[in-house]
Amino acid sequence: MKIAVIGAGIYGCHIALKLSEAGFNVDLIERESDIMKITTDISLRAHSGYFYGRSPETMIACNKNSKLFLKEYPNSLFDHDKHYYIIAKNGSKITGKEYLATLDKYKLPYKKTKVPLINPDFVDVAIEVEELSYDPNLLREEVRIKLKKSKVNLILNTDVSDLPFREYDLRIISGYASNNDISRAITGKTIQ
């Protein structure tokens, strides 16, 4: 089976590597000049689930996957000083009480705190958590090494509209903000 993975961010690279390890013929296609250039530098957190207080399924998945991420890419992770999550008194779609109840239910550890430089009059609840960060340059290099050792065919500087997609048995879109543009180029339709 020949597979195209479109988008060489961390997810696209990881998917391509795992499919290649499973014995599939994989082309990893990226329009930029290098892997992980667009979104990798934005978050810098190996999300452990705290961000998703209104979605227990996502919270659980993130918590599980952050542990897998640590095993898979240990050289790019480091323990950062402090990570805070804050629920505002007004305008939030979840209350502090609901948020803490969800964290307790799914056993995500936290410590209630006051956050420096944040006016406590606007805060329903603030917590400090232990959550790893990643260095985007170290992560990029770690992934680059894995790709070079693999059988993944990395195709850079290539727009999806330039590719003969009928040659692929499966096409996986991993383009983040570009998902609809990629889908439209391949199928003529946007992702719903």
What do the predicted segments below correspond to?
Residues Y134-Q192:
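Predominantly flavin-linked oxidoreductase catalytic cores and closely associated redox partners
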